[in-house]
């Protein structure tokens, strides 16, 4: 499915801008992950763009996980995917209080003789924005991510303090009243990325885009953390290079 065709349907559905959606779509088109996992789908807008890119690739499947509360949203992921005619590209899973329980069950299902066989090429963590939940989610997802795969975090610079200023004391099931002042003030995802992901010996190609998205690849490579903008031109250039090299 072409990007513009997907965008006509998905524009206006929270929570992804068209610019970010283009970067995500082009990443899927260029890297061609087959088995994708999304932790946190809200209304399914980003899920729709991933599914559209997988459909354009001619192969692949997305598993999207969120909380049971997402059934009550005014626009559900099921409605979003149905409007794209891409429901068959996505398996929707819901857990009561955390996608980490889903990850536990996946690790269990993939384990034989005490060894977990990884099963995903791309993991997109876009949920709680909380050190305790997403810090654990990284280590659990790592067990399921194949060598050479990519992991992406949304909300790199998001803070509970900013949400509180907007009058929101609870975010993704976490109450700010249960957090210490320094955890409220510090971007939790940034802490996860720099203290857990960027220090992990199996990861490289660290990139922070627009202080919003944070990428890493499970492969040997440069340890430097680069800060860039979400360049649509750059993603298109990568796609063109892949075509020229015969990998598109």
Positions of the model-derived regions?
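N-terminal, positively charged/glycine-rich alpha-helical extensions of SAM-dependent methyltransferases
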Residues: 1-5
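S-adenosylmethionine/decaboxylated-SAM
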Residues: 7-14, 18-248
């Amino acid at each position: 499915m072409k990007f513009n065709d997907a965008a006509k349907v998905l524009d206006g559905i929270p929570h992804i801008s068209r610019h970010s959606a283009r970067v995500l779509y082009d990443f899927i088109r260029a890297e061609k992950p087959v088995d994708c996992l999304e932790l946190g789908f809200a209304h399914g807008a980003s899920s729709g763009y991933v599914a559209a890119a997988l459909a354009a690739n001619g192969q692949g499947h997305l598993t999207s996980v969120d909380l049971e509360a997402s059934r009550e949203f005014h626009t559900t992921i099921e409605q979003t995917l149905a409007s794209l005619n891409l429901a068959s590209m996505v398996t929707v899973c819901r857990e009561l209080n955390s996608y980490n329980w889903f990850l536990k069950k996946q690790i269990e299902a993939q384990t034989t003789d005490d060894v977990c066989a990884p099963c995903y090429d791309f993991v997109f963590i876009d949920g709680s924005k909380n050190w305790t939940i997403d810090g654990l989610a990284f280590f659990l997802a790592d067990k399921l991510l194949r060598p050479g795969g990519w992991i992406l975090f949304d909300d790199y610079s998001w803070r509970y303090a900013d949400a509180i200023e907007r009058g929101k004391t609870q975010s993704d099931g976490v109450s700010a009243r249960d957090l210490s002042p320094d955890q409220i003030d510090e971007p939790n995802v940034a802490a996860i990325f720099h203290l857990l992901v960027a220090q992990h010996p199996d990861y490289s190609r660290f990139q922070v885009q627009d202080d919003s998205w944070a990428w890493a690849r499970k492969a040997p490579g440069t340890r430097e953390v680069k800060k860039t903008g979400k360049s649509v031109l750059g993603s298109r250039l990568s796609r063109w290079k892949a075509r020229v090299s015969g990998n598109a």
